[in-house]
Amino acid sequence: MPHERVPDWPTDRWQMWLGKGRHFLAFPVRAGKLINYVGFVPTDEEMKESWTAPGNPEVLRQAFVGWDPRIHQLLGEVQVTFRWALYDREPLPVWTKQRLGLLGDAAHPMLPHLGQGANQSIEDGIALATILARANRATAPSALLAYERLRRERVAQVQRGARENGLRYDSAYSDLGVRDAEITAHATFRKRLYDHDVVPDAQAAAAALM
């Protein structure tokens, strides 16, 4: 939503509220001109996978009744919402076959709890382009296999990490002291995740094809 609707909302940080079975996230985008917000709530309703299914702002507000007044302030300004279901899938055992290869969500659909779906797709694209630049029609299957070997385990770790992070965001998760310690320790995993440079590894994989 436009920041002008909630002018006192901070634009220098993201904020998350954790509760039993649900959590709420809000953060600035477009240099603070907009505030993006997401409410995660459980449901038994079967939903189609869609990014454009309309939601009901009042239903969203009711899902967080009794929570922090800042959430009520934000949701009080909501006029339009969208909703989508989160489906968890196990990492695929195979990404490629002969001259056919998968990347991005087709290869590794993941939960959003690390914010890594698009990032990992970009890494895929860089790795694939770097390796295929050294390939020809005859060596394409080997190049695709090299791409899969380079990327599959790293992305599987991210998929599993997103799942585990989502569980931590539920206050019913184990002992809260243990949960909070895990969230703090998770900074090390995030640094390793964010600092990764796929280019040198992809170049080495490409050179090995020669």
Outline where the language-model segments fall.
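Residue-level signal for pocket-adjacent positions within structured domains
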Residues: 1-4, 46, 81, 87-90, ...
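Conserved mid-domain beta->alpha element of the FAD-binding
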Residues: 26, 57-60, 80-168
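Short aromatic-enriched loop/helix-cap "lid" or pocket-rim segments at secondary-structure transitions
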Residues: 11, 50, 158-160, 170
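Solvent-exposed, flexible loop/coil residues
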Residues: 21-22, 33, 45, 55, ...
